[in-house]
């Protein structure tokens, strides 16, 4: 048998390695911008065309490279950052593996212009698919100028799986923001299709945060700072009242590097546990400075997962520092020991006999004396109760749900026996008792009519469930979830057919977004318009909401659009279909009948019929149970 194992060509090996390092255009920008920072650049310009699919250009004023270094930098594992394994535990640079440039050159057409400050001429290098096409001297500025064109041109399968331009641009902006947040001492700019998205001058950290996410955040940030022999923690956390379900800006950085750390995230959120609703999040920008020997950066290709040697101790320090910051800025309830506004407490002399308290009273008052003239006397007459007024609103409300002609109810021969009331139930107010009686009578009446006319029983239980008999037993239907199921299917048809009805607003709402979110919003504008939203771009990340879908007048349109936007950013794949589902579900939840709403028999019948006309009546779009059936044999067992 002949030998079957052989070495792969460098070009193939580089393409395989690129699959880990270069996943999308944002990965290219991350690697090249980090290289520029390692080269001590003070100004970095990023230019992208078609969300980086056509061209990515990174221009910096860093140290630059010599002719030899420029050629060698595209070889695998060629780096200036480390020389031996021990250097991995003393890293102060962003890159160190020497894989990025080789991986980029393996799947794109790359042109590099670079010059050292001490040299008059620079070097121009052209590489495509790991093959050097040309290298020549050129006149250029100090630093480096990378141009990456036609990403994945030789890997069609990878290029085919790139997402929509809006999604890829959002990923680029996210990477750009992470780097800009950790290096406020560097000036950055970002252009997309010749449009300026960011122009960030050198500034303090707080100003850099506001420049990226908006000045509105300024009033929401609390300072956090603690310095120990193990770790130095600094940055900002948001006030509890700014919590939201989606869209919180949450960033951890360690030694100038962005990282994801679920364990430390729990430490931050634990401090907010009693201050914000369950399931909501707050923004934070937290920076760690740790001895490089106590962390391991080299455990993930993207270097975003970092292992700490003293993880549990740092968790405790982080949680305590967040709590301290919240308490210091009065973000949590605290005991006030300020005595400035306290009442004066008199000092009593000792050895004095106790004296009875002085009580002021009217010695001429006689409760049994009959008053004359009906005024100023001591008798008390109970005010007349206007009983009709108590039931006025109830009568009007009752008539709205009643049929045109209400038959007489035979109370004496009613088939239902009155349950004995316990003592606690008798304490209910007269109005509530009357309301319950009217509701019960109305439901009983409709039930009897249903039995007579259709032979099927529809009852409402606790203002939440609809009870109806089926062949196998008794079916319980959650009225709120059932209505969501029905409305969701209707809205989905409208969205897909672009038949959404828009209702104009008297005063347009203004939605202010950072650049990364604005890029995603541009990609889903058509889907928003299809369901009835009318948005206009005011520039600078500001959008005016001029119209909203009919039926959601009670909701905050800004928060509604923001929630759908953040969900689209999280999903990434199949954005259009996902947004359609989100829109339909959100609108269905907003317009659905609520728990406690009394339904007439006709309304219950209509809802049940509409539910079973749906393709999937058993569950809501988000997987919650709509109905359940109690089998007849199970009911019979209860009476054995």
Swiss-Prot record:
Entries under Pfam families matching the protein: DNA_mis_repair, HATPase_c_3, MutL_C
Encoding gene (name): mutL
Entry keywords, A to Z: DNA damage, DNA repair
Biological function: This protein is involved in the repair of mismatches in DNA. It is required for dam-dependent methyl-directed DNA mismatch repair. May act as a 'molecular matchmaker', a protein that promotes the formation of a stable complex between two or more DNA-binding proteins in an ATP-dependent manner without itself being part of a final effector complex.
GO CC list: mismatch repair complex
One MF annotation (Gene Ontology) recorded for this entry: ATP binding
UniProt-listed NCBIfam families: mutl
Protein name: DNA mismatch repair protein MutL
Superkingdom of the source species: Bacteria
UniProt xrefs under PROSITE patterns: DNA_MISMATCH_REPAIR_1
InterPro entries named in the record: DNA_mismatch_repair_CS, DNA_mismatch_repair_MutL, DNA_mismatch_S5_2-like, HATPase_C_sf, MutL/Mlh/PMS, MutL/Mlh/Pms-like, MutL_C, MutL_C_dimsub
Coiled coil: none
Annotated family: Belongs to the DNA mismatch repair MutL/HexB family.
Organism: Bacteroides thetaiotaomicron (strain ATCC 29148 / DSM 2079 / JCM 5827 / CCUG 10774 / NCTC 10582 / VPI-5482 / E50)
Entry's Gene Ontology BP terms: mismatch repair
């Amino acid at each position: 048998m002949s030998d079957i194992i052989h070495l792969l060509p460098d070009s193939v090996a580089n393409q395989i390695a690129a699959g880990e390092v270069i996943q999308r255009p944002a990965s290219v920008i991350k690697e090249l911008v980090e290289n520029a920072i390692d080269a001590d650049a003070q100004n970095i310009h990023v230019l992208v065309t078609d969300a980086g699919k056509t061209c990515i250009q990174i221009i910096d004023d860093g140290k630059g490279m010599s002719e030899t270094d420029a050629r060698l930098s595209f070889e695998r594992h060629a780096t200036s950052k480390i020389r031996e394994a021990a250097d991995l535990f003393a890293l102060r640079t962003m890159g160190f593996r020497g894989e990025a440039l080789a991986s980029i050159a393996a799947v794109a057409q790359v042109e590099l212009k670079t010059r050292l400050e001490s040299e008059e001429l620079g070097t121009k290098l052209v590489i495509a698919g790991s093959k050097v096409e040309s290298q020549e001297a050129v006149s250029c500025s100090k630093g480096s100028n990378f141009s990456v064109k036609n990403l994945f041109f030789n890997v069609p399968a990878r290029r085919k799986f790139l997402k929509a331009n809006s999604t890829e641009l959002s990923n680029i902006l996210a990477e750009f923001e992470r780097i800009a947040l950790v290096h406020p001492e560097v000036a950055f700019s970002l252009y997309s299709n010749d449009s300026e998205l960011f122009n960030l001058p050198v500034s303090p950290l707080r100003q850099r945060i506001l420049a990226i996410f908006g000045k509105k955040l300024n009033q929401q940030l609390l300072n956090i700072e603690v310095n120990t022999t193990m770790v130095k923690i600094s940055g900002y956390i948001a006030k509890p009242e700014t919590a939201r379900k989606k869209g919180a800006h949450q960033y951890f950085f360690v030694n100038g590097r962005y990282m994801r750390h679920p364990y430390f995230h729990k430490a931050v959120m634990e401090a907010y546990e009693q201050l914000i609703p369950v399931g909501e999040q707050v923004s934070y920008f937290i920076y760690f400075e740790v001895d490089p020997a106590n962390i391991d950066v080299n455990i993930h290709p993207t270097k975003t997962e970092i292992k700490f040697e003293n993880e549990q101790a740092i968790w405790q320090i982080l949680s305590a520092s967040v709590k301290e910051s919240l308490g210091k800025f009065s973000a949590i309830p605290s005991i006030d020991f300020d005595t400035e506004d306290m009442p004066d407490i008199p000092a009593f002399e000792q050895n004095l006999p106790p004296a009875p308290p002085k009580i002021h009273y009217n010695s001429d008052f006689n409760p049994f004396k009959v008053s004359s003239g009906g005024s100023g006397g001591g008798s008390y007459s109970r005010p007349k109760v206007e009983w009709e007024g108590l039931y006025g609103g109830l009568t009007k409300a009752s008539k709205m749900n009643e049929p045109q002609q209400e038959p007489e109810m035979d109370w004496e021969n009613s088939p239902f026996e009155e349950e004995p009331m316990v003592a606690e139930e008798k304490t209910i107010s007269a109005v509530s008792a009357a309301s319950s009686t009217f509701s019960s009578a109305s439901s009983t009446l409709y039930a009897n009519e249903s039995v007579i006319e259709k032979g099927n029983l529809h009852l409402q239980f606790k203002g939440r469930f609809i009870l109806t008999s089926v062949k196998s037993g008794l079916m319980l239907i959650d009225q709120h979830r059932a209505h969501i199921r029905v409305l969701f299917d209707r809205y989905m048809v409208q969205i897909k057919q672009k038949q959404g009805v828009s209702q104009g607003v008297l005063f347009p709402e203004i939605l202010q977004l950072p650049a990364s979110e604005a890029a995603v919003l541009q990609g889903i504008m058509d889907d928003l318009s299809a369901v009835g939203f009318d948005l206009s771009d005011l520039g600078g990340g500001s959008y005016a909401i001029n119209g909203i879908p009919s039926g959601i007048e009670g909701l905050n349109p800004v928060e509604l659009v923001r929630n759908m936007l953040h969900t689209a950013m999280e999903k990434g794949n199949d954005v259009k279909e996902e947004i359609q589902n989100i829109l339909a579900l959100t609108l269905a939840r907003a317009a659905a009948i609520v728990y406690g709403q009394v339904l007439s028999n006709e309304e219950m019948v209509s809802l049940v019929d509409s539910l079973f006309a749906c393709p999937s009546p058993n569950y809501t779009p988000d997987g919650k149970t709509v109905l359940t059936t109690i089998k007849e044999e199970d009911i019979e067992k209860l009476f054995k």
